[in-house]
């Protein structure tokens, strides 16, 4: 080519291209494809006519709005709720479009079956199951079935088992400081105890005491989130290339391999007990093995189910219990109220599990239950705790069309704190439910308890797909809180105050470095 016939700029470009290696050409090409993919985005379904909300200006590119939803979802949703709470609106993300629906639609969708609107698939899709080995949990409802069919009907039995494991865990894992105030990183302490309890109920011994299992059960959530975060840096069409190269994913696989060996031993114990005619249903793994399909029965699938259970239960329960303690330290006048109630229940009914089964004993703690319900109301584990994936096209009574494949959510936290609904809802009122239970002529005594679902308490979801393990979680939290209040005093370190809840996307988080001052007061 006669370069002298071209202009100087064109000459430089051609000379530069001639000098490039294949790597030098591939990297800019890949970057261009990445930018185009993110700029254009996949056409995720949206409710017809619903406006896209969150742009800072009419000139802001969509990929910038989508990027802001990772750390700015709370602010975008808050402003959208204020302006558009009575109509559907859309918050776009790189991985989906979230269709925010008005609260008025809750009653209409609450009983829709999961083959039409599915909440389970929304939860697990946030962990990119295809690339975090969680696909068996996405394809199966075995975990939900064991909670609804085994755990809940036998809740009293499993709460009693929890009491025994909690006794053991407190003796071995909780520090003793005599009567001197000591600053303690207490969140890892309660996380470990909760992990032991979960493993005892679901896997049994010896797995619940296996240090490798405790580490993996605690860490699998963070590991899967790390893989997901790494993958979200790339367009979805590149994930099959990127995923095998991620160090975070290789680390997760190594942990899964270790977990499989632990679960395999528990499966062997189950099989040997069957051969010996010693069928034992103390663990939920036993029920799962007896009621699973051939596809669900593999060691890897059962291990994934156990990891998914840990993901769905340990960190959420820890988050809720930590928030209760933080609320109490922010309002220390409520410590003596709860301790007086505990002392009275012990005076009348003895220690937990001695004269009454643990579940019935915990039901006597009405003031504690009310305080817990209030903290759960104001500090849900998900900003949009009610979500669905539309597996079929749905038309609502007012003509609103929900397209197949659309992801739906409700601004549940904003609704339960909306001053236009009730001017008192934004304030922490620990006896709110206690007063409601004791209003009237006794007809409300079994209502307004922690874990029950209504339009004022949406932290566990809503309708027929609300969290199936919520009643066990509530009993677990109350039991641990009772033990902590009987044995320890708490306060914030000098100069510290209540840590704020913050959100990464829709997921609620606490400062993991937040500590408390603790000291022994008495021994159970």
Curated annotation (Swiss-Prot):
E.C. no: 1.-.-.-
Stored SUPFAM superfamilies:
Cytochrome P450
From its record, what is one biological process in GO terms?
secondary metabolic process
Instruction: Give UniProt keywords alphabetically.
Output: Glycoprotein, Heme, Iron, Membrane, Metal-binding, Monooxygenase, Oxidoreductase, Transmembrane, Transmembrane helix
Q: Pathway of this protein?
A: Mycotoxin biosynthesis
Q: Which positions are glycosylated?
A: 291, 444, 454
Please give the start and end residues of each transmembrane region: 13-36
Per its UniProt record, the required cofactor names are: heme
| Tagged with keyword tRNA processing | no
Which purpose does this protein serve, as stated in its record? Cytochrome P450 monooxygenase; part of the core atranone cluster (CAC) which products are predicted to catalyze most or all steps of mycotoxin atranone synthesis, starting from geranylgeranyl pyrophosphate (GGPP). The initial cyclization of GGPP to dolabellane is probably performed by the terpene cyclase ATR13. The Baeyer-Villiger oxidation near the end of the atranone synthesis, which converts atranones D and E to atranones F and G is predicted to be catalyzed by the monooxygenase ATR8. Of the CAC's other predicted gene products, the reducing PKS ATR6 might synthesize a polyketide chain.
Q: Which family does it belong to?
A: Belongs to the cytochrome P450 family.
The entry's protein name is Cytochrome P450 monooxygenase ATR4
UniProt lineage:
Eukaryota, Fungi, Dikarya, Ascomycota, Pezizomycotina
């Amino acid at each position: 080519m006669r370069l002298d016939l071209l202009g100087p700029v064109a000459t430089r470009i051609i000379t530069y291209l001639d000098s490039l290696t294949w790597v030098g050409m591939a990297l800019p090409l890949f970057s261009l494809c990445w930018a185009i993919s993110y700029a254009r985005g996949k056409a995720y379904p949206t409710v017809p006519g619903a406006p896209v909300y969150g742009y800072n200006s009419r000139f802001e590119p969509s990929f910038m709005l989508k990027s802001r939803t990772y750390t700015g979802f709370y602010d975008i949703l808050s402003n959208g709720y204020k302006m558009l709470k009575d109509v559907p609106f859309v918050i776009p993300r790189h991985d989906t479009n979230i269709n925010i629906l008005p609260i008025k639609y809750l009653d209409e969708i609450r009983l829709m079956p999961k083959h039409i609107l599915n909440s389970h698939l929304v939860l697990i899709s946030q962990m990119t199951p295809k690339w975090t080995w969680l696909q068996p949990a996405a394809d199966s409802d075995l975990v939900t079935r064991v909670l609804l069919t085994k755990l809940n009907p036998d809740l009293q039995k499993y709460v009693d088992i929890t009491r025994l494991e909690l006794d053991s865990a407190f003796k071995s894992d909780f520090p003793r400081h005599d009567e001197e105030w000591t600053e303690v990183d207490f969140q890892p302490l309660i996380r470990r105890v909760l992990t032991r309890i979960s493993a005892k109920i679901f896997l049994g011994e010896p797995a619940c005491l296996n240090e490798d299992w405790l580490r993996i059960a605690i860490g699998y959530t963070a590991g899967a989130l790390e893989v997901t975060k790494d993958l979200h840096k790339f367009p979805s069409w590149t994930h099959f290339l990127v995923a095998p190269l991620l160090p975070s994913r290789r680390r997760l696989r190594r942990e899964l391999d270790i977990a499989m060996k632990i679960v395999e031993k528990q499966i062997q114990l189950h099989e040997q007990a069957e051969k010996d005619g010693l069928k034992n249903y103390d663990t939920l793994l036993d029920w799962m093995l007896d009621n699973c399909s051939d596809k669900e029965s593999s060691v890897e699938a059962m291990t994934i189910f156990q990891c998914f259970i840990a993901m769905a239960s340990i960190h959420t329960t820890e988050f809720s219990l930590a928030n209760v303690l933080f609320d109490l330290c922010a309002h220390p006048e409520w410590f003596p109220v709860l301790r007086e109630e505990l002392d009275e229940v012990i005076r009348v009914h003895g220690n937990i599990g001695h004269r009454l089964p643990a579940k019935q004993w915990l039901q006597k703690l009405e003031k504690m239950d009310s305080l817990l319900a209030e903290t759960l109301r104001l500090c849900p584990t998900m900003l949009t705790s009610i979500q669905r994936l539309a597996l079929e096209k749905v038309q609502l009574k007012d003509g609103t069309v929900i397209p197949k494949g659309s992801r739906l959510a409700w601004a549940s936290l904003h609704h339960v704190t909306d001053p236009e609904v009730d001017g008192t809802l934004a304030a922490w009122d620990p006896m709110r439910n206690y007063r409601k239970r004791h209003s009237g002529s006794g007809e409300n005594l079994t209502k307004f308890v922690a874990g029950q679902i209504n339009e004022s308490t949406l932290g566990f979801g809503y309708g027929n797909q609300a969290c199936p393990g919520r009643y066990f979680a509530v009993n677990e939290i109350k039991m641990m809180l009772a033990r902590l209040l009987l044995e320890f005093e708490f306060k914030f370190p000098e100069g510290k105050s209540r840590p704020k809840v913050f959100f990464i996307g829709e997921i609620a988080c606490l400062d993991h470095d937040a500590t408390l001052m603790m000291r022994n007061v008495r021994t159970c």
